[in-house]
Curated annotation (Swiss-Prot):
Designated gene of the protein: fd96Ca
CC terms in the record's Gene Ontology section: nucleus
Name the UniProt record assigns to this protein: Fork head domain-containing protein FD4
The keyword Nucleus is annotated on this UniProt entry: yes
GO molecular function: DNA-binding transcription factor activity, RNA polymerase II-specific; RNA polymerase II cis-regulatory region sequence-specific DNA binding
Principal subcellular localisation of the protein: nucleus
Expression across tissues: Expressed in early embryogenesis in 14 symmetrical pairs of segmentally arranged neuroblasts. Also, later in embryogenesis, in a cluster of cells in head region.
Residues covered by region (Disordered): 225-245, 261-281
Protein task: Involved in development during embryogenesis.
């Protein structure tokens, strides 16, 4: 007996699983991907049975989307209205239906663990890049941001303040708010551009303002002898010690690090010595990454501040890409490396070179063995 046609289902439940219904909705889209709301709309428009008890079947459909590897969640482009990600069908899942029939499905589609982890990492990175450029476009152009050099990224760390602010009160007196404290290391031109961050007009504390109720004991070396040795009194007179009600703060530092200098000249020497002694560079703040930034993951080939970068600092690669996605099927092999140039003018990214694996390592990965 032939199966009934689609139009004759009426109020009866159609013989399609939730996976088949979702795949049918995705395939009906010109871009082969749809947000969740459009998937709901397609099903209710096509099959009257699903116009009632919507909460029940929509919960089941969301469960199938989340726990089936045949569906992938593609981040929404920032230039598209609406909210929520898009759902697409994995290219390797096209043959899970026998002879292209949505009524019969082969065994459950399952991705290899390594492929699934790689895909999730790439899609997460893509979502972060989309969010970053969306923030840049709304908050200001990347051309107005100060360039960042990873060689000087260590200089962007906040150096310790001359005096601890852990127990400072919220105000200097009744009705007088406590001003913001800006370290001396952040005021130079070699560090973050304060004019772009809107911090040029912040007041700074003077030495007399922060001297108030706090005092700082001399720092001690981190040795057993220094820890068990009693502290030497700062005041030779016992009367002065009794009258002194200032809060003492013990600060223990590792040997080899001198006390933070308070004079400008000594501060510059301290900064130079500190930079040379640091062995690792921190990740730069997100708001400072722009076309002039040399971050290993983000290689910009063109942009507003790229002229200041040496040509040798950016690796050569024949593949260039931007952040827009036009079709999920074109990005599955390497999602970030196969995006099309649609928007984000003056920002072109160069995909990093593919990591080489020896045949032995690749065989271990294919056999789902853990390698260290």
């Amino acid at each position: 007996m032939p199966r009934p046609s689609r139009e004759s289902y009426g109020e009866q439940k159609p013989p399609y699983s939730y996976i088949s219904l979702t795949a049918m909705a995705i395939w009906s889209s010109p871009e082969k991907m749809l947000p969740l709301s459009d998937i709901y709309k397609f099903i209710t428009d096509r099959f009257p049975y699903y116009r009632k008890n919507t909460q029940r079947w929509q919960n089941s459909l969301r469960h199938n989307l989340s726990f089936n590897d045949c569906f992938i969640k593609v981040p929404r482009r920032p230039d598209r209205p609406g909210k929520g990600a898009y759902w697409a069908l994995h290219p390797q899942a096209f043959d899970m239906f026998e002879n292209g029939s949505l009524l019969r499905r082969r065994k459950r589609f399952k991705l290899h663990k390594n492929d699934k982890d790689l895909l999730n990492e790439e899609l997460t990175a893509l979502a972060n890049l989309n969010r970053f450029f969306f923030t840049t476009r709304n908050g200001g152009s990347a051309a107005h941001m100060s360039p960042l050099d990873m060689n000087n990224a260590a200089a962007m760390r906040l150096d310790p303040l001359p005096r601890s602010t852990a127990h400072m009160p919220n105000s200097l007196g009744p009705g007088v708010p406590l001003p913001h404290v800006m370290p001396a290391s952040m005021s130079g031109a070699d560090h973050t551009n304060l004019a772009d961050m809107g911090l040029t007009n912040l007041p700074a504390l003077t030495s007399s303002e922060i001297e108030g109720p706090l005092s700082l004991r001399p720092k001690r070396s981190f040795t057993i002898e220094s820890l068990i040795t009693p502290d030497k009194p700062e005041h030779p007179s016992e009367d002065e010690d009794d009258e002194d009600d200032r809060v003492d703060i013990d600060v223990v530092e590792c040997s080899g690090i001198s006390r933070y200098p308070t004079t400008p000249a000594a501060s510059e020497e301290y900064m130079s010595a500190s930079r040379s002694s640091r062995t690792e560079d921190p990740l730069p703040p997100m708001h400072t990454i722009n076309a002039g930034a040399h971050v290993p993951f983000l290689h910009y080939a063109t942009g507003a501040n790229v002229a200041g970068l040496p040509a040798s600092g950016i690796p050569n690669s024949p593949t260039t890409y931007e952040l827009a996605i036009s079709h999920p099927l074109f990005m599955m092999a390497a999602p970030i490396a196969n995006m099309h140039n649609i928007y984000y003018n003056n920002v072109t990214l160069v995909a990093p070179a593919q990591q080489y694996r020896s045949p032995e390592v690749q065989n271990r990965i294919d056999n789902d063995m853990r390698t260290i």
